[in-house]
Amino acid sequence: MQHWLDKLTDLAAIEGDECILKTGLADIADHFGFTGYAYLHIQHRHITAVTNYHRQWQSTYFDKKFEALDPVVKRARSRKHIFTWSGEHERPTLSKDERAFYDHASDFGIRSGITIPIKTANGFMSMFTMASDKPVIDLDREIDAVAAAATIGQIHARISFLRTTPTAEDAAWLDPKEATYLRWIAVGKTMEEIADVEGVKYNSVRVKLREAMKRFDVRSKAHLTALAIRRKLI
């Protein structure tokens, strides 16, 4: 039988839109006996997901900001190479909150899995997981770490180039004034010019944009504008 990583490599080469890609990922997960798949792209504190996990679990995960608690994400950030995990097997080493997290995930058939993290552009990272409802993942053969990273690199590139719509992402918002000022920034206006056009004081524009930068945890207006455009907030 062809290994699931080989199938992912084949899928990455297929022409088509994001629907074909998402359907293909779900089919591969199902064919090889996994509960589902999850692709996470982590840009500093901004996280997007492409996954077929249960919708309720996706909502809960992002609403409660579980990425900060998730032992799999923590491990992926530090290891940067393929690993298996099991909520039950790791239980003795987990905190009370981490055990509760795994217990909650198990309600949706996520008890163990295989995760492949990779470095991506600008110092960010992506990770791809195949999850299982079994207590422990039983690998039929050893997986080459370099080959695994290469495969997920191709999946990451495919998702990026297709500008695939996330199935879930962390909450982000701009109030009306912030959105208005950022739209002006996006077309090249300075804060002084924005204040003049909008009939407000320069300091009002500066404070509003500073508040938004703090909320998005970015250090420049250019970065804030790029995030707002990417997330279709302006």
UniProtKB/Swiss-Prot annotation:
Family matches, as CDD domains: LuxR_C_like
Record bears the keyword Glycoprotein: no
Gene Ontology molecular function, alphabetical: DNA-binding transcription activator activity; transcription cis-regulatory region binding
InterPro entries assigned to the protein according to its UniProt record, in alphabetical order: Sig_transdc_resp-reg_C-effctor, TF_LuxR_autoind-bd_dom, TF_LuxR_autoind-bd_dom_sf, Tscrpt_reg_LuxR_C, WH-like_DNA-bd_sf
SUPFAM superfamilies: C-terminal effector domain of the bipartite response regulators, Pheromone-binding domain of LuxR-like quorum-sensing transcription factors
Regions recorded as binding DNA: 191-210
Origin superkingdom: Bacteria
HTH luxR-type domain residues: 167-232
Pfam families found in the cross-reference section: Autoind_bind, GerE
Family: Belongs to the autoinducer-regulated transcriptional regulatory protein family.
Name of the featured protein: Transcriptional activator protein TraR
Gene source species: Rhizobium radiobacter
The organism's taxonomic lineage, starting at the top: Bacteria, Pseudomonadati, Pseudomonadota, Alphaproteobacteria, Hyphomicrobiales
